[in-house]
């Protein structure tokens, strides 16, 4: 399993993460299908494997992997609006009276309840890696909302989960702008060919560059007029490439073939072995990559009082 995005959270207290206890806790809130009148459900699933015997916590070396699944019924807003409009017009025509907001809202609720059993089902899963020794939780998502859904549900079943988004001492925008402007990144990091530039003024312009030489005059001209880099494609060593944004979100992670080939060799012929090998190698790589990234961004910022 190779993460494609990364939201990084710092555990602010030492928690005794025990795989068996965590397994028991997650089992109290399993993922389940939506009932006929439910809009959404959320719960934990096995990250690898299927069936009742598949563990909810995958453990490899000092790392743990968990997964949560959201199931939701999709009701297009336009369908609901059209049905409400039709019903309101019918009432007003037949009863010769005006339908006001309170009654309109009631009609909308009734229509939603009537439509729910026939609505399409959408399922989505979110994975999180727990690294207790490093004090980190890494969520495979670029959406803070999806990450918070998982973390808050994990907090619910554990009773406590003191975490916060990891922050650095120097704003990523300042560092990325400097790297492009000076045409030199931190050690072991390499600027690639994609970036987003934004004007710092309110309602300022946005320039998105793709497959472009970021050392060229055009980019330097944008920087000289006050634009800053808010997204930048980078590579680290010869192991991975990614897009970093101004919110410290790592997107579009891609692990190089050398790592993937090694995981394939380590994992053997079974699917579970392949998944375990790739997860383990990914986490060991993160063990070197993330401290280097934090250092390149001025080091981790520890808020006062923590």
Curated annotation (Swiss-Prot):
One Pfam match: RdgC
Compartments reported by the entry: Cytoplasm, Nucleoid
GO biological processes: DNA recombination; regulation of DNA recombination
Alphabetically ordered keywords of this record: Cytoplasm, DNA recombination
InterPro entries to which the protein is assigned, alphabetical: RdgC
Superkingdom of the organism of origin: Bacteria
MF terms (GO), sorted A to Z: double-stranded DNA binding
GO CC list: bacterial nucleoid; cytoplasm
Record-stated family: Belongs to the RdgC family.
Chain's role: May be involved in recombination.
Name of the protein in question: Recombination-associated protein RdgC
Annotated organism of origin: Pseudomonas fluorescens (strain ATCC BAA-477 / NRRL B-23932 / Pf-5)
